[in-house]
UniProtKB/Swiss-Prot annotation:
The keyword Mitochondrion does not apply. Transcription activator required for the expression of genes involved in the catabolism of aromatic amino acids such as the aromatic aminotransferase II ARO9 and the phenylpyruvate decarboxylase ARO10. GO terms for molecular function: DNA-binding transcription factor activity, RNA polymerase II-specific; sequence-specific DNA binding; zinc ion binding. The keyword Metal-binding applies. This is Transcriptional activator ARO80. Gene3D superfamilies: Zn(2)-C6 fungal-type DNA-binding domain (4.10.240.10). Keywords: Branched-chain amino acid catabolism, DNA-binding, Metal-binding, Nucleus, Phenylalanine catabolism, Transcription, Transcription regulation, Tryptophan catabolism, Tyrosine catabolism, Zinc. Residues 801-810 have a biased composition (Basic and acidic residues). It is found in: Nucleus. GO terms for biological process: aromatic amino acid family catabolic process; branched-chain amino acid catabolic process; L-phenylalanine catabolic process; L-tryptophan catabolic process; positive regulation of transcription by RNA polymerase II; tyrosine catabolic process. Residues 25-58 bind DNA. Residues 843-854 have a biased composition (Low complexity).
């Protein structure tokens, strides 16, 4: 029982045996197991039994208590030599430098609060993976710093032989712990130590942040010069002067079709900061601009520009391949625009099956690849027109997808109005061509364009008028470099600026937005998230930009509801009544667009164009405005053609349509036909200015689809009654479509495409040949049609020519009919007396036509071309077999809706063209010369009717 007696007074300093005298190690605590350090009254040196058995490092955290928790006499007693080996020396020996475990005195509470307030600077909100990584990086920097101190401390400590006595082993650690826990140091000294550790931790965090900034500065943003590129120099592929000439020519001739490159980058020196965009512009410009037209040396054979184009394209491929690794230097707006440029203007290699690493073992050798002769590829069999288009669509789909992903990552879509427009137009167009779901389709549903015009009441603080521009003016223009760029862009441009009312023009708004995106939003850290750079106000789009977005929005909706099959959402069927219901939904959308943006439909005026004006900034701005008007006209009319062409999809196997349904269908078909004509008329206006050869691929495809729809109407009208659908024939007869006019349109389009060909591989060259071949094949059908009685072939009297058809006995006077109102150089199409479902259409070529109800609206030069057509048909070059039944009866058997027939039917015509051997260049040139001679009269007629610009 004596063992259970309380200790005597001499041993009052001893601790109760029930109280734990040591902590468990971190490993044992994490597994919630007993940490065995021997007897409680005589613990041994770490590691514990479990860590020693598992060969783990035995680590202890510091004591959670404070120094004031122990009575002074206990501290003094612990320091007595009689105790020698206490638990405290073990705790102090294993104390971690982690700040949160350091005991604080009562006088150190304010220091703790100070740390909590200052330490929040690096406690990031873990809202994303990137924030989490930044947090871990800072924490790792702090721990690494402390770990390095421990390593240095361990290396500086002289190792001592291990003794069985605990006192000899931990004497130095005990002495250090006693110093920290002595009464004299429990207040001031402890506070100073804590403050030192606080300052050390905060300084460590600051150093970590500075270190991350320094890492970002290891490779600073390069300041490139034009001479720095490997392919530019006196003995290189291009000289500096030649590169500048090509860039200036691009912005004069090609950029107006694609006005989405920031104004600051029109300067070659600024453009050189973006290597991939710089090279992309040089590549496409070299193909479309022979050097001799720029006053440069084009080689002895006159093909040096083609050689430069091919070699620059190989160089561009290397740059493009490097962008997939998400290198910081490639994550720029220049990369986004470079990808889109190659979708608008394809390289020549799109027409060839180029060797790559998968089918050419020599390309595995880097040296062999660099020295491979590009000219040998010209001898390979090239892709046909349709094959080249398919490859172009695939390339556009992939490049546009990469551009959209990068723009989303960097926040360009939210920050830049130009990037927003170009990504939505290119991505939606490529998705439609590939029959895929658009990546940006959802953004149309949440987009608010603020369709009302921007009006300024004279108050400069009006945020509805200024928006982000006020932010830009306050934050950007005070910078001297920004002022200098402003001066360079707008000097000698004669920009219309109203100084009295302080109006901002569209050009100035675009400049400020571009300046923010290029030089401010990502200038410090290109790894920041996109949401960190969103300007304080929503994007402000110009009037023309909003018009383009609205058109592509309607097209996107039409594609998903009419044509899209991937998600089983196609609403169009062979049931014409159902199709008419679908079209009735889109009619108000198109008419609403026209009522809002009618003033933008300004045809191109006959202003002289010359490459010598490429250094004239005013001429460049004027060119952009003029071509932009034609672009909007083309976009609007293609939207109508894309949607209303569905009205000609009639299934003859189902029940016949009644009169009202035929008239309604004819109304839509006529709008589609006139839209196709207006697209071709727009192309002719641009061609008269010598600008059509610079048009992007998107324009070429729309021209081809327009002429294909016209050919479909022609073949349906002139086809045999047994092969064609009678309802479709009746619809076309009511649509006031002239057969004579249709044949002339096909011929003129073939000549226009041939003249717009920049080289022998361009798509225009291929389709011009196909259309000329089609004209030769259509001659017998044309002759047989002309031999019919006039009432049976004249498209201007469709009702009288069909007295014996199913329309007989119908009272047509009670049905809605067409009327036209001509004014302000615009032709307004309405439906009277009660309906007005569609559009007031812009057609400058039909200004002199007469008001009709039963007559078709025919251009005045059509009748004068009858003699020309007869001469063409009697020419010996037109002698040969007529169109086969497979070609003419295609539309009766095909179930393609809308414009889906264009690609397979065009491929069929192209195959027949190749099989018949009419691809011979001599025969092609002879046909072209014949067509040109007959077309000169048309040009004289058109020139006698000049188009005035508002």
């Amino acid at each position: 029982m004596s063992a259970k007696k309380r200790p005597s007074g001499n041993a009052a300093f001893e601790l109760p045996k029930r109280r734990r005298t040591y902590q468990a190690c971190i490993s044992c605590r994490s597994r919630k197991v007993k940490c065995d350090l021997g007897p409680v009254d005589n613990p041994h040196d770490p590691p514990c039994a479990r860590c020693k058995r598992e060969l783990k490092k035995c680590i202890f955290s510091s004591n959670k208590g404070t120094s004031n928790d122990l009575p002074p006499n206990s501290i003094n007693a612990i320091s007595l030599p009689s105790l020698g080996k206490s638990k405290q020396e073990i705790q102090n020996d294993s104390t971690s430098p982690i700040l949160s475990d350091v005991p604080l005195s009562r006088k150190g509470i304010s220091s703790e609060k100070s740390f909590k307030s200052e330490g929040m600077k690096w406690k990031l909100e873990l809202s994303s993976m990137q924030n989490a990584l930044e947090f871990l990086a800072q924490a790792a920097g702090t721990v690494a710093k402390e770990g390095a101190k421990e390593i240095i401390k361990e290396k500086s400590t002289t190792p001592k032989p291990l003794k069985s006595s605990l006192d000899a082993t931990n004497k130095s650690a005990t002495d250090e712990g006693l110093k920290r826990l002595s009464k004299s140091d429990s207040t001031n000294t402890l506070y100073e130590n804590t403050a030192d550790m606080l300052n050390h931790t905060l300084n460590t965090n600051r150093k970590t942040s500075q270190l991350m900034e320094e890492i970002g500065k290891v490779r600073p943003p390069p300041t490139r010069k034009i001479d720095d590129f490997d392919y530019i120099g006196p003995d290189s592929l291009l000289t500096k002067e030649e590169a500048i000439e090509l860039i200036e020519a691009f912005f004069l001739t090609m950029h107006p079709f694609f006005p989405n490159i920031p104004l600051q980058l029109h300067d070659p020196k600024e453009l050189a900061e973006y290597p991939i965009l710089f090279c992309a512009i040089l590549t496409v410009s070299a193909r479309y601009h022979p050097f001799d037209t720029l006053g440069l040396d084009n080689g002895e054979d006159g093909m040096r520009h083609i050689e430069v184009h091919d070699k620059l394209w190989v160089y561009c491929q290397k740059l493009i391949s490097q962008t997939i690794w998400a290198e910081a230097s490639t994550r720029s707006i220049g990369t986004v625009l470079a990808f889109i440029i190659f979708t608008e203007w394809n390289p020549r290699s799109i027409h060839y099956k180029w060797s790559d690493y998968a089918n050419d073992p020599e390309l595995n050798n880097v040296n062999a690849r660099g020295s491979k002769n590009i000219s040998t590829r010209k001898d390979e069999e090239g892709l046909t027109g349709v094959g080249a288009i398919r490859r172009s669509d695939r390339m556009s789909w992939m490049l546009t997808g990469s551009a959209v992903r990068l723009a989303q990552d960097m926040g360009f879509i939210e920050n830049s109005s130009k990037v927003f427009i170009v990504t939505h137009i290119s991505e939606t167009t490529s998705a439609m061509n590939m029959n895929q779901r658009s990546l940006l389709a959802e953004s149309f549903s949440v987009l608010n364009l603020n369709l009302g015009k921007i009006e300024n009441d004279g108050n400069e603080s009006n945020e509805d008028y200024l928006g982000n521009e006020k932010f830009y003016l306050n934050e950007i223009l005070p910078d001297e470099e920004s002022k200098l760029r402003w001066k360079r862009v707008f000097e000698n441009s004669e920009n219309d600026h109203d100084n009295e009312k302080n109006f901002l023009t569209d050009w100035e708004r675009e400049f400020l937005n571009d300046e923010y995106v290029l030089y401010y939003s990502n200038k410090k850290d290109d790894t920041n998230l996109a949401q960190n750079h969103i300007p304080p106000f929503p994007l402000r789009f110009s009037f023309a930009q909003r018009a383009k977005i609205e058109i592509i929005r309607i097209l996107s909706i039409a594609y998903e509801t009419i044509y899209c099959e991937k998600n089983k959402r196609k609403l169009a069927t062979t049931d014409q009544r159902h199709n008419l219901s679908v079209l009735s939904v889109f009619s108000p959308l198109i008419e609403g667009w026209l009522s809002n943006y009618r003033e933008l439909l300004v045809p191109l005026s006959d202003v002289p164009f010359s490459l010598a004006d490429r250094k004239n900034k005013k001429q460049i701005f004027d060119n952009i405005d003029r071509i932009n008007g034609e672009s909007i006209i083309t976009d609007f009319n293609y939207c109508q053609l894309y949607i209303f062409s569905l009205a000609l999809q009639v299934d003859g196997k189902t029940s016949r349509l009644n009169m009202n349904e035929i008239v309604t269908s004819a109304r839509y078909v006529e709008l589609a036909y006139r839209s196709a004509k207006e697209i071709l008329s727009s192309a002719k206006r641009v061609s008269r200015q010598g600008m059509l050869k610079y048009m992007p691929v998107r324009w070429v495809i729309r021209i081809i689809r327009s002429i294909a729809f016209i050919v479909k109407c022609y073949l349906t009208l002139t086809g045999s009654e047994l092969a064609t659908n009678p309802d479709a024939r009746n619809i076309l007869k009511l649509s006031a479509i002239s057969v004579d006019e249709t044949f002339d349109i096909i011929r003129d389009t073939a000549v226009t495409l041939k003249e717009a060909t920049p080289d022998e591989l361009h798509l225009c060259q291929r389709y011009a040949a196909i259309l000329m071949y089609l004209c030769t094949e259509m001659k017998l059908r044309k002759k047989s049609y002309l031999e019919r009685p006039p009432l049976l072939r004249d498209g201007t009297t469709p009702l009288e020519s069909n007295r014996e058809s199913s329309l007989e006995g119908q009272d047509l006077t009670k049905k809605p009919i067409f009327s036209k109102r001509i004014g302000y150089n615009k032709t307004e199409t309405t439906f009277e007396p009660s309906e007005r479902p569609l559009t007031e259409e812009i057609n400058s070529n039909s200004q002199n036509s007469n008001d009709t109800s039963s007559k078709g609206i025919v251009d005045p030069f059509v009748e004068q071309n009858n003699d020309i057509t007869t001469a063409l048909l009697n020419n010996e070059l037109f002698q040969g077999p007529s169109l086969s039944d497979e070609v003419t009866d295609w539309f009766g058997a095909s179930e393609d809706i809308g414009l889906e027939f264009v690609e397979p039917w065009t491929e069929l015509i192209e195959q027949r063209y190749m099989q018949c051997g009419d691809g011979d260049n001599n025969n092609f040139e002879n046909l072209y010369n014949l067509f040109v001679n007959s077309n000169n009269i048309n040009n004289d007629i058109n020139n006698s009717r000049p188009i005035t610009r508002k």
